[in-house]
A protein has these predicted regions:
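Cofactor-/ligand-binding subdomain signature composed of acidic, glycine-rich
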Residues: 1-19, 266-282
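Glycine-rich, histidine-containing beta strand-loop boundary motifs that form or position
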Residues: 31, 53-55, 123-124, 152-154, ...
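Thiamine diphosphate
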Residues: 74-106, 112-116, 142-273, 289-291, ...
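Cofactor-binding active-site loop characterized by glycine-rich and histidine/acidic residues
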Residues: 18, 25-146, 311-312, 317, ...
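Conserved short loop/turn motifs at secondary-structure junctions
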Residues: 22-26, 123-127, 228-235, 364-369, ...
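Extended, hydrophobic alpha-helical segments in both membrane/secreted and soluble proteins
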Residues: 119, 123-124, 128, 132-136, ...
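Hydrophobic/aromatic ligand-binding patch that stacks against planar heteroaromatic rings
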Residues: 139, 218, 328, 352-353, ...
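Helix-enriched interaction subdomains in cytosolic or periplasmic regions
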Residues: 279, 414-458
Length: 600
């Protein structure tokens, strides 16, 4: 049996490497859980049992083993398989995934509603330290939900290295493997004793020893039965343990030690790089050369500012490298704080730093700052604290799909009092925005960064808060563009002129506050006014302009060029922008329809 399963694992690993090398994706996490997922498939019934993966980035093997093997080479491509779990894609996917901390709370709901079905939750050693996960564990143990099996995949990594007490705790658990066997022997011995008095005395002694010498007592005191596999990529060790815990009444926690990137030498050597990777050469492990990103521009500039001002602190929630903070973290480790997957904690921590006279920069992806809206309002806005927020991956992100697109943050930042919001349109404006941020003490400041290559224009005027800049001057049609949309409208500027559409193009990096002077004194002279933004159209930049014009008695029709739908699928960023009629010929046709009522 183990020989057949080993061969299956080898075939799956080969498939993973081949497909991810072409499409990009989460290679390291999936290589690490091949044996675990194959053994789960062997022991449990995926049609009857409810299997949940926290985050879902490590569920590629699960997709292959269920009903998607033939389509696996389409993963992360437009209209292909989703990069995460999606109930619309397969009946085997019970809950949408993408963010950390969702699987255990959802498992509680499934377990209560389906008491006769086994609920299996695979959660990473980083995700389990997330507040939502811990809240769910607390409830599961308290209610003694017997049909839940929690499998903690311990590979000692999230995207980067794990941080915090719980990570250290799990390492201690792994190192305590010998005691687990001793504990089982002691329990077996106690259970064979007939004299109740002696039995109770030995049970108290066992609990006392356990509390002093092992970390198991903490888990068991929460109501869990605990088991441990220290060689999680060894089928002969893993399979018997899964069979053992299958029919146990729980709740049960099984800690499985795996190796991230297992079976591909480059992924084993560079675990962080291969956590989530762009297409790469299998023979060398090298990705294909990309242009400079806005995240890199930010990383270089914040390092420069950090050298100038020792009060600057940077914070990220398990995204040090992804947000461009790697150089800063190397140069100033004591001023670069990685909170782990704990966005709300990061925001309130930054508020404490700001309250103490420091200059905190919270660097988080747009999709993840959603998880800290309460802290943004309660801990930052109400106190009007000068916390700087660098919101990376704003707008459409592409292949990671609907759970990762950054299309909501602008809407809620515009709604929260005291926030200033900047959407730089060029890399120079980003650098200028960061320079301004260093001594900005008027309240919280947001700087949005897209997942895009950098763009610049010649003879660019300096960025000013509350002021916009005319880039092209026309007479009939006004285009007010923020963020990435300046680059996009300038790309079609010549073609618009060729089609008889005269254009004034305004660069609007300052989204909040608006350039009220421009709106009051210049907007009336244009026949058609377009506001372009890469954000969900509801409560957006264009909404703010409409509200301002209405409040000042200015009656003008505003054409809103934005994302019409809140849920954007996965695919290449360029493809999705064109589908949304936000780029190229599709945008030109959209503009023509708005001006002429039809395509010209």
């Amino acid at each position: 049996m183990s020989g057949e399963l080993t061969k299956k694992c080898e075939e799956i690993r080969k498939k993973l490497i081949e497909v991810v090398s072409k499409n990009g994706g989460h290679l390291g996490p999936n290589l690490g859980v091949v044996e675990l997922t194959v053994c789960l498939d062997e022991v449990f019934d995926f049609k009857e049992d409810i299997v949940l993966f926290d985050v879902g980035h490590q569920a590629y093997v699960y997709k292959i083993l269920t009903d998607r093997a033939e389509k696996f080479d389409t993963i992360r491509t437009r209209k292909g398989l989703s990069p995460f779990l999606d109930p619309n894609e397969s009946s085997y996917d019970h809950f949408v995934s993408g963010h950390a901390g969702t699987a255990l709370p959802a498992a509680v709901g499934f377990a209560i509603a389906n008491p006769d079905r086994k609920v299996i939750v695979v959660v990473g050693d980083a995700s389990i330290s997330n507040g939502h996960s811990l809240e769910a564990l607390n409830y599961i143990g308290y209610k003694k939900l017997e049909n839940i099996l929690v499998i903690v995949n311990d590979n000692e990594m999230s995207i980067g290295e794990n941080v915090g007490f719980i990570s250290k705790f799990l390492k201690k658990v792994i190192s305590s493997g010998k005691y687990q066997n001793f504990r089982e022997d002691v329990k077996s011995f106690i259970n064979r004793i007939k004299a109740d008095r002696v039995k109770r005395t030995l049970e108290r002694l066992e609990r006392s020893i356990k509390g002093y010498v092992t970390p198991f007592y903490a888990l068991e005191s929460l109501g869990f039965r605990f088991f441990n596999v220290s060689e999680g990529n060894n089928i002969e060790k893993l399979l018997p343990m899964l069979k053992k815990v299958k029919d146990l009444k729980g709740p049960v926690i099984l800690l499985v030690k795996t190796e991230k990137g297992k079976g591909y030498c480059f992924a084993e050597e560079n675990k962080e790089k291969f956590h989530g990777i762009a297409p790469f050469n299998i023979e060398t492990g090298n990705t294909y050369k990309n242009s400079v990103s806005y995240s890199e521009v930010f990383g270089n500039k914040i390092l420069e500012l950090g050298k100038e001002d020792e009060n600057i602190y940077t914070l990220s929630a398990a995204m040090i490298k992804g947000t461009g903070l790697y150089k800063f973290s190397e140069e100033f480790p004591e001023r670069c704080i990685d909170t782990g997957i704990a966005e709300g904690f990061a925001v309130t921590l930054a508020a404490g730093l700001a309250k103490s006279g420091k200059k905190p920069y919270v660097c988080i992806y747009s999709t993840f700052i959603q998880r800290a809206v309460s802290q943004l309002i309660h801990d930052v806005s109400i106190q009007n604290l000068p916390v700087r927020f660098i919101i990376d991956r704003s707008g459409i992100v592409g292949e990671d799909g609907k759970t990762h697109n950054g299309i909501y943050d602008l809407s809620f930042f515009l709604s929260i009092q005291n926030f200033t919001v900047l959407c730089p349109t060029t890399s120079k404006e980003l650098e200028q925005a960061l320079e301004i941020s260093k001594d900005f003490n008027s309240g919280p400041l947001v700087i949005r960064i897209p997942r895009d290559s950098i763009f610049d224009i010649e003879d660019e005027k300096p960025l000013e808060i509350g002021r916009w800049k005319e880039i092209k001057k026309g007479s009939k049609n006004l285009f007010i563009a923020t963020g990435t949309m300046l680059k996009i409208i300038l790309e079609i500027y010549d073609e618009l002129k060729n089609r008889g559409i005269d254009c004034t193009i305004v660069s609007a990096a300052s989204v909040k506050p608006l350039d009220e002077n421009y709106l009051l004194n210049y907007i009336k002279e244009y026949d058609n006014i377009f506001v372009l933004e890469e954000n969900y159209v509801k409560n957006s930049f264009s909404t703010s302009i409409l509200e301002f014009l209405n409040d000042n008695g200015i009656q003008k029709l505003i054409h809103r060029i934005a994302l019409k739908y809140a849920i954007i699928p996965h695919g290449k960023r360029e493809e999705l922008l064109k589908e949304e009629k936000l780029k190229g010929e599709s945008l030109i046709e959209r503009i023509e329809e708005l001006i002429y009522g039809r395509k010209k």
